[in-house]
Amino acid sequence: MTNLFKITGTVTLKKGAGRQLKSGGMWVYDNEIDTFSETVEDGGLIELHDFDDYFMGIGFVNRRSKITVRMLSRHEGEINEEFIKQRVKDAVSYRMDTVDTSSCRLIFGEADFLPGIVIDKFSDVLVVESLALGIDRFKQLIVDDLKEILKEYGMPIRGVYERSDAKVRQLEGMERVKGFIGEEFDTKVMITENGVKYYVDVKDGQKTGLFLDQKYNRRAIGGLCKGAKVLDCFTHTGSFALNAGISGASSVLGVDASELAVNQATENAKLNGLEDIVRFKCADVFDLLPQLEKSGEKFDVVILDPPAFTKSRNSIKNAVKGYREINLRGMKLVKDGGYLATCSCSHFMDPELFTKTIGEAARNVHKRLRQIEYRTQSPDHPILWSADESLYLKFYIFQVVDEK
């Protein structure tokens, strides 16, 4: 496609379709569409009309995807380089107002009205994840705009790495891509977050290298960890464990099934001078927790930060079983009056269902939960109301007490 900004045709909705869209949603699904004009090009821009031919907006189209249209604008008018640059400016300006920008998510797809692209900043390195065909064609333009805008804020970028290697790209008819955008650089980046130093592996780490969405949740557990014996399950590269360590925990055990992650976590502990307090074990959490219970272990604080147990509605029942089991096991290991931090990062595990599942786990082990905090993802992962896909992280902190 020679002209990125060309409107390639019109997509028309079925009669009565598009209710979610009309209430603020950002996606149009394949089963909501009536017709495509002959000129429509997959990956291109289109006008979206309702069944009565009323203009509803401009978006990217991809007939190979169940999410067939991703909305870019609700207004008539030209989409051009300045339009895209303003979206990027708005995204950066929002982060400057709301979060520590030394390391943060700068662009969060639909929630920043740039559907299908995620860009994280780790110190002076950008990591790009493109998940949709339409926005993929704007990727270089967005990166160039971002570098220019950050430089104006006094934050020059030394390198950009692409981690568009998620399986979801195949649903868009795209290959999984990974590599440098521009000049090569050392992909092991050191950052500081909440006073904790980390090495972030942007090339081979999970997702883009570090889960920035938990930034302030990691800090929130600190006050409970002073002098405490702490268990951090699904520790990844040790972020919750290290926050517990610098907050004065007496001992911390971090557990993860990935040997690569555990090795990185151990290195991060040494980087912070915490290797005598924070130690890590490579093990399956579902296997280890019953073993710890059998041996009579108890902890002042237990942290559960599992991966998404479901990425579709079809597997939600199995996910509920997984979350119930892990919370049940975790509660059994908390001392009477101790604390549990537990979360779900699956969009399909909605807040109501997650809350219900935790409650069932507590009843099964005869524990009472005293809620201290309920939190979501950090503000650099904004939750756009009516765009349900932007809310995915649920995070509780409880005091766990025996039934009285």
Feature roles, as predicted:
Residues E82, Q86, D90-T98, K151-E172, ...:
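A short, charged
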Residues M1-S123:
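Non-catalytic accessory regions of SAM-dependent methyltransferases
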Residues R70-I79, V127-K139:
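Short histidine-centered catalytic/ligand-binding loop motif
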Residues I107-D120, K139-L210, R219:
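Non-catalytic substrate-recognition/targeting regions of SAM-dependent transferases
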Residues S65, G134-D136, Q206-K207:
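Short, surface-exposed beta-strand-loop junctions and turns on beta-sheet-rich folds
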Residues G179-K404:
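Rossmann-like S-adenosyl-L-methionine
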